[in-house]
């Protein structure tokens, strides 16, 4: 038995009961072609060729007409179709009205009152009631030939009707099959979109149309409403993403790093343009990314308006803020088709910096959306007539805080590096330890259970938006003397900036007041140089060996240590120099050095052999250390030797550590102090360290 069963829609052709006789055929030929005398072979061939030509012409005319119909505008077809439908409706209404008038007038002869209710006023006025009647008549009898003709005509009409019905059924079946295939393809693509995680819903304005939501629910209202697009069915069931009439080309936020007019770093587009229209998921992602970039630039502009006092500039569609002392960050919104410069000639580090800034922008905007979600899911505050403010998102502030903090940290790192090289060139030990970017924990309001619900990602971002802190711990030259510099940069809009805190622990000043807080890094630098100068002043007496007895040296050092260093001015002589001890004045050429004015870096030493006082001045900068030693003029009767001050100058520079010279070839501070304590030190001016 066959598996398929076919049901023919067209009726079976039946042969005629009998063929027409010869007389009938001859009569038909005479009626169509004329007399047989005019029929020749040439005329028949000519007639056949003419029929062929007419057939080809009709085919070409049909093709031309079909092409012209295809070129017609769809709108014109729509108007024509609507006009035809209106005309058909009017004709049907008129024909129905005429039929009603006819039947009413016909019935008015037998039931005038009932028929009068369905007659129009014009018909009542023009035609009297009962003027139209109908009677049954006996139809005339038909001959056998007429009956056969009527049966043949009826059978022909039936066959033609069945054939037309079969064609319409087959066309309907084909159209239904195409519609089923289109619907299957449409819903399969909708299902693919749903399976990929996109939210499919009905459009608010068109409930019968499906749409896909690719926006962000926590965005502002302008961008939240634009995050919904219709999923319309195109040709052959192809899915079309309809975003409305305000469609813009995809754009992205571009970040550039510039020094002056020179571009050092540049970001690549965060979204890629979809050239393949068949990839619907790619086009949805492109629409989502483009909308996200537009919202990001909008929020950056909002925040930049309140940060103008912190160096942020707005130039039409361009944002600018400083990255360090020499570089600036430029942010703008550009299209994907805009020509980009060749990034091959740019600095890779600056490219990474630009990429980091762009990604930080996007992460902080997503974090702002997360905070909006938490705020929306919490218990709402009491209803008030005042409109709740919409504060700006913290997107630029954390980066400003980071760049400012990094600039200060690098500046102090360079300062301590140069200062340590300067001291090492003089043979002194100076070490410092760096603790960069230590994030202070921010206290959270709420119970411990609420704190535990915070995800690790949010805790990570909290460290980014909290104040930044770095610590530099440095050991002074003297043993046990240390200080610590704390650099703190706040993100709070009411106090955005850096604060410097200096905590000291000096062996020579156990009762010092600390910490010291500053707002300028130059003030911190001056205080650090001052601390090193004080440390050097009290270190110099311990560097000299063999110039005096251990007891006298210990006595002098302890005398000027601690708080007594600033209160023993009454023991000085009229030359404002401390008197030298009288012990062993005949044997000692130069007594130990005494800090006379430690705040100014001055020391003095008395020479019993020459009855004069020698002064030593210490001048410390970050890149050089300078010692200036000379005799103080005596007020009594001068000799020829006293007229020559015997000034000597010693300099150590940080660049000496980069010259490649060995440390043994450079005189140290201890060696210089030993030379200054010898009897033959009165030589011409020297400059140690400069080559």
Curated annotation (Swiss-Prot):
What is a single Pfam family found in this protein's UniProt entry? Med17
Which keywords accompany this UniProt record? Activator, Coiled coil, Nucleus, Transcription, Transcription regulation
Q: Name one GO biological process term.
A: regulation of transcription by RNA polymerase II
Q: Which GO terms describe its molecular function?
A: transcription coregulator activity
The primary location reported for this protein is nucleus
- List each coiled-coil range: 158-185
Q: Which domain of life is it from?
A: Eukaryota
The record, for InterPro entries, names: Mediator_Med17
Q: What does this protein do?
A: Component of the Mediator complex, a coactivator involved in the regulated transcription of nearly all RNA polymerase II-dependent genes. Mediator functions as a bridge to convey information from gene-specific regulatory proteins to the basal RNA polymerase II transcription machinery. Mediator is recruited to promoters by direct interactions with regulatory proteins and serves as a scaffold for the assembly of a functional preinitiation complex with RNA polymerase II and the general transcription factors.
The family this protein is said to belong to: Belongs to the Mediator complex subunit 17 family.
Q: How does it assemble?
A: Component of the Mediator complex.
Q: What is this protein called?
A: Mediator of RNA polymerase II transcription subunit 17
Q: Which organism is the protein's source?
A: Coccidioides immitis (strain RS)
């Amino acid at each position: 038995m066959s598996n398929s069963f076919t049901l023919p829609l067209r009726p079976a052709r039946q042969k005629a009961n009998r063929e027409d006789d010869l007389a009938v055929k001859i009569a038909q030929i005479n009626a169509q072609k004329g007399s047989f005398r005019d029929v020749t072979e040439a005329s028949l061939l000519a007639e056949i060729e003419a029929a062929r030509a007419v057939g080809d012409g009709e085919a070409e005319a049909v093709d031309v007409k079909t092409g012209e119909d295809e070129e017609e505008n769809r709108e014109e077809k729509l108007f024509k179709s609507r006009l035809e439908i209106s005309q058909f409706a009017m004709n049907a209404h008129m024909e129905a009205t005429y039929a009603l008038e006819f039947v009413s007038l016909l019935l008015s002869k037998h039931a005038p009152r009932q028929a009068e209710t369905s007659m129009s006023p014009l018909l009542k006025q023009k035609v009297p009631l009962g003027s139209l009647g109908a009677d049954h008549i006996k139809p005339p009898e038909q001959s056998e030939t007429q009956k056969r003709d009527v049966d043949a005509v009826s059978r022909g009409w039936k066959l033609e009707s069945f054939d037309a019905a079969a064609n319409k059924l087959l066309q309907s079946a084909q159209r239904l099959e195409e519609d089923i295939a289109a619907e299957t393809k449409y819903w399969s693509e909708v299902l693919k979109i749903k399976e990929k995680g996109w939210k499919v819903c009905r459009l608010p304005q068109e409930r019968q149309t499906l749409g896909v939501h690719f926006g962000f629910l926590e965005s502002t209202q302008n961008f939240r409403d634009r995050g919904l697009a219709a999923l319309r069915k195109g040709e052959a069931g192809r899915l079309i993403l309809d975003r409305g009439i305000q469609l813009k080309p995809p754009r992205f936020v571009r970040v550039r790093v510039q020094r002056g007019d020179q571009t050092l770093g540049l970001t690549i587009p965060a979204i890629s343009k979809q050239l393949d229209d068949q990839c619907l998921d790619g086009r949805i992602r492109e629409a989502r990314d483009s909308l996200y970039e537009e919202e990001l630039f909008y929020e950056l502009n909002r925040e930049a308006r309140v940060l103008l006092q912190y160096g942020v500039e707005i130039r039409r569609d361009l944002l600018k803020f400083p990255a360090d002392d020499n570089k600036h960050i430029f942010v703008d919104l550009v299209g994907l088709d805009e020509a980009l410069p060749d990034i091959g000639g740019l600095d890779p580090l600056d490219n990474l910096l630009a990429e980091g800034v762009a990604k930080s922008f996007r992460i902080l905007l997503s974090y702002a959306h997360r905070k909006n979600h938490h705020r929306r899911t919490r218990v709402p505050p009491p209803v008030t007539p005042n409109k709740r403010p919409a504060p700006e998102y913290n997107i630029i502030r954390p980066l400003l805080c980071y760049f400012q903090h990094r600039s200060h940290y690098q500046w102090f790192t360079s300062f301590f590096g140069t200062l340590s090289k300067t001291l090492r060139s003089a043979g002194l030990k100076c070490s410092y330890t760096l603790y960069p970017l230590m994030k202070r924990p921010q206290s959270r309001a709420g119970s411990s259970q609420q704190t535990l619900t915070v995800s690790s990602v949010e805790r990570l971002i909290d460290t980014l938006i909290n104040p930044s802190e770095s610590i530099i711990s440095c050991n002074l030259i003297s043993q046990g003397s240390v200080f610590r510099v704390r650099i703190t940069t706040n993100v709070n809009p009411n106090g955005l900036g850096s604060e410097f805190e200096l905590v000291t622990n000096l062996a020579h000043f156990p009762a010092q007041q600390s910490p010291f807080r500053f707002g300028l890094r130059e003030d911190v630098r001056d205080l650090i140089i001052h601390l090193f100068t004080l440390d050097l002043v009290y270190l110099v007496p311990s560097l000299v060996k063999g110039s005096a007895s251990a007891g006298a040296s210990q006595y002098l050092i302890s005398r000027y240590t601690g708080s007594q260093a600033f209160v023993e001015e009454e023991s000085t002589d009229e030359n404002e120099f401390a008197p030298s001890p009288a012990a062993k004045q005949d044997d000692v050429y130069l007594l130990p050095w005494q800090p006379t004015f430690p705040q100014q870096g001055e020391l003095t030493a008395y020479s019993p052999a020459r009855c004069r006082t020698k002064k030593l001045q210490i001048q410390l900068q970050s890149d050089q250390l300078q010692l200036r030693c000379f005799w103080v003029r005596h007020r009594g009767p001068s000799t020829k030797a006293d007229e020559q001050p015997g000034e000597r100058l010693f300099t150590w520079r940080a660049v000496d550590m980069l010259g490649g010279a060995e440390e043994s070839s450079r005189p140290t501070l201890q060696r210089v102090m030993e030379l200054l304590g010898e009897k033959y030190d009165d030589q011409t001016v020297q400059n140690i360290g400069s080559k």
